[in-house]
Amino acid sequence: MTALRNAALFYYTDKEKPMSEIKGRIHSTESFGAADGPGVRFIVFVHGCRMRCRYCHNPDTWSMEGDDTTVEMSPEEILSKALRYKSYWKNGGGITVSGGEPLLQIDFLLELFKQAKAEGVSTCIDTAGNPFTREDPFFSKFQELMKYTDLLLLDLKEINPERHKNITGFDNANILDMAQYLSEIGKPVWIRHVLVPDLSDFDEDLDKLNEFIKTLKNVEKVEVLPYHTLGKFKWENLGIKYTLEDTNPPSAERIDNANKRLCAGKYACKG
């Protein structure tokens, strides 16, 4: 990793413009993502997340410091790597930054998206919204970031604040405020809800979440994401107790119920 960082000091994308001093702490990248935004997308997974979602499938991204596999990369380096796959982005594809929580590295994200838009690249953020506040310095940076962001995938984990805290360790007031702000500025959003039996699958909460979503004027799509255990091994590798050991994925009936109540999937509401 040290060698990579030192080599990066001599990287240039333009003979007259040295590499940005801003670096992102990168966990990994995926060249052909098909589930995190429209079209085929280059996915950047960044480090750092304050929430501790009990079903998280990327707990290895929680730490801002990362581990021996973590690399520091400039926006130029990431964009250069992503643009190798631009020929696959003809149907609305582009770059999605996920994590971890991308908004914890907002300076890096802003610079990356500025450069991406200069190249005509579609930009998307996959976020749970936890860092959001209408206070500066974050808010002014976020407002600027939105000028270069085409779409946000916003994970609303629970509408009930106590249940949200049980899932993540935090309440959801600022996250719902972020959703409302994005509606105010007309920024396109896909709402996502991870459906976990006995944790985020309650009819009354699904109905309340739907009522909240209906107050927003910018929601293009709602997605129900059924709980799975594909990331459980990461918890074990990190020596962290997995508290959903006895929780099974939701049944087909409960998935259908959630889709219907949230106007998602085949029940997508028109107009």
Which stretches of residues belong to each language-model region?
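N-terminal pre-catalytic segment of deacetylase/amide-hydrolase enzymes
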Residues: 70, 77-80
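Short glycine-enriched, charge-decorated loop/helix-capping segments at active-site entrances
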Residues: 61-63, 67-69, 165-171, 239-247
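Conserved AdoMet/S-adenosylmethionine-binding subsite of the radical SAM
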Residues: 79-87, 91-94, 99, 103-225, ...
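N-terminal [4Fe-4S]-dependent radical SAM core
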Residues: 2, 9-72, 84-91
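Generic domain-boundary/flexible-linker signal
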Residues: 37, 55, 64, 106, ...
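Auxiliary Fe-S-binding modules of radical SAM enzymes
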Residues: 4-35, 80, 190, 195-271
